[in-house]
């Protein structure tokens, strides 16, 4: 029969290990959002969701973004964000290094890239874009840049890309007549201000792919990932939660695993 001293030693060891595990869990986390739109617009849409998740988990989660998509990519590569909402191509890169782990994604959604043009412009097909300049958010914007440019290249349509840092900047620059056309995605096109959207038309759409990932940096413990994932999924279960999601044009949130983005990996895209 174990002696009292042995039992006491075991109890102290368990307590010590539990204390170490608790110390490893962070109480303040940053949630980085890809800057497809202005920081103020993104903060208005995401901060109420993060507040709700913070209240449910007891973990303080604060909104963060970057001035441009390339700077956001740099922060992801350096692991600056504890949690992040990133495009599908970003996820395939940054799940490798620094090792972000997918926990959730938009429900009932496939992301599609679009090419938009001025509504009154005499552009009716992709062929009309040959030898023009086009606006795109950033080189690694998956659906808004990579997919449209691949299609144009496949049709031997020569264009000169100009990177204007965000989706909203693409739409506004086309509406202002700075470019005849540019790349975006359906969700951000639907969210752009009506006075801009009314001047644009969708010229072409890509096929659908797994949408953006909500992912956690590997320094976030598995138990905290489960807590945050559960809180995200719980948004589906209340009217208030569904209203918060609707501000993002989300019909709901699904759990996610790394393999969900194998359709994007199958494109074998690499940065040249």
Task: Set out the residue ranges of the language-model regions.
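Pocket-lining segment of extracytoplasmic ligand-binding domains
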Residues: 121-122, 131-223
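Periplasmic-binding protein-like
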Residues: 27-36, 42, 108-117, 195-236, ...
């Amino acid at each position: 029969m174990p002696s009292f001293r042995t039992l006491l030693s075991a109890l102290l060891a368990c307590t010590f290990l539990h204390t170490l595990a608790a110390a490893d869990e962070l109480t303040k986390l940053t949630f980085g959002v890809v800057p497809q739109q202005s920081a103020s617009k993104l903060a208005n849409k995401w901060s109420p969701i993060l507040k709700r998740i913070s209240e449910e988990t007891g973990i303080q989660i604060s909104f963060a973004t970057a001035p441009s998509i390339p700077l956001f990519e740099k922060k992801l590569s350096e692991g600056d964000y504890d949690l992040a909402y990133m495009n599908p191509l970003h996820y395939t890169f940054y799940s490798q290094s620094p090792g972000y782990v997918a926990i959730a994604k938009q429900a009932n959604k496939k992301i599609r890239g679009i090419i938009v043009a001025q509504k009154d412009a005499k552009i009716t097909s992709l062929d009309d874009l040959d030898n023009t300049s086009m606006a795109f958010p950033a080189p690694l914007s998956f659906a808004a840049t990579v997919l449209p440019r691949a299609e144009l290249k496949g049709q031997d349509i020569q264009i000169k890309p100009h990177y204007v840092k965000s989706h909203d900047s693409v739409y506004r620059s086309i509406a202002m007549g700075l470019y005849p056309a540019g790349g975006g995605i359906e969700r951000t096109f639907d969210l752009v201000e009506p006075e801009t959207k009314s001047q644009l038309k969708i010229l072409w759409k890509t096929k659908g792919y797994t949408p953006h990932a909500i992912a956690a940096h590997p320094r976030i413990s598995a138990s905290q990932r489960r807590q945050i994932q559960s809180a995200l999924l719980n948004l589906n279960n209340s009217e208030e939660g569904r209203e918060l999601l609707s501000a993002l044009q989300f019909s709901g949130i699904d759990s996610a695993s790394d393999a969900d983005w194998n359709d994007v990996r199958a494109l074998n895209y690499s940065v040249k």
